[in-house]
Amino acid sequence: VKEGFMSQVPETEWPRMRRLRHLAFLVWGLFFLVVVAGGTVRVLEAGMGCPDWPTCYGLLIPPTSEAQLPPDYRVRFAVAGRLAEPFDPLKTWAEYINRLLTVVAGLGVLALVGYVWLRFRRYKRVLLYATAIPAALVAEALLGWQVVATYLAQHLVTLHMIFTLVLTILAFMVAAQTYALRGRELRGNSLWYWRLGWLGWVLLGVQVLLGATLRSWVRDLGVETALESVLFYVHRSFSWVVVGFWAYFHWRVYMDPVRLRFARRWAMVTTILIVTQVFVGAIMSYFSFSGFWKVLHLLLGLLSMNTAYAALYFYKYSEYVHASGSYVFRVA
């Protein structure tokens, strides 16, 4: 029985859809583990901890001491005309663990895509989102290789982060297809608020990119110089613009005449994440620019972009197709 672009799924398939949702959110979580690992690598300046790719010093399992490497290893593993960095086991293993987590996330993606193709390939949208994930993951892996090959070129590092955001949103969209919801027609104020929310999401993305650029300045110029730059003051002041936009959208979600259960939850989480991110940024500016706070700041930025996207999605897709809340998929 079709209802717009939705189609009721037989009751016998409900357990499979619940498994699909859990698997999609598992992959989503694995991507964020990779974000934490990648952020740690960046904070430790361990991006060249393994100077070659996909091996590490030509080995599948990296060494634990410099004595295990050939005497000319810095020349042998030179990158972009530069000698390899002196061996540091902490940096090497941080980068290696980052790569291992990426492989685990890749295996999760294969399981997700295989499950979709095996059980749900007739549902076009869920198939599209699931199939797009490995394509984006391959691009992400190639970018990782280029980041190493170019000795951490800043524009590639930033692009690498953007692809991570794309991957997490694609995983969320696979999970979102398993809810028994259809899009409501947005008119008047509701349409205006929805568009305002998307503008807030774009501004949040700009803020995350400003932060990524500022982190690179800290690395290249030092903390004191970077924190005295115009970019720092723009980044700090712009955070209040983002908070204002999102706080207003959050309030409008709660004031909407339609009871938006999912949108309210995700909007609340987003508000908490953004405010926490501003608080962490203040700690970094005035008290401590330590690695822990930098990783947390980056993680909060990417998490808030995901949860804000979810809130905007469920602001529109908020009507249950059946009062029983049965599971449905998009078929077109």
Where are these predicted regions, by residue range?
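Individual transmembrane alpha-helix segments
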Residues: 73-107, 235
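N-terminal signal-anchor transmembrane alpha helix
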Residues: 20-58, 204-210
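Interfacial helix-loop-helix junctions of multi-pass membrane proteins
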Residues: 40-52, 138-161, 215-230, 279-303
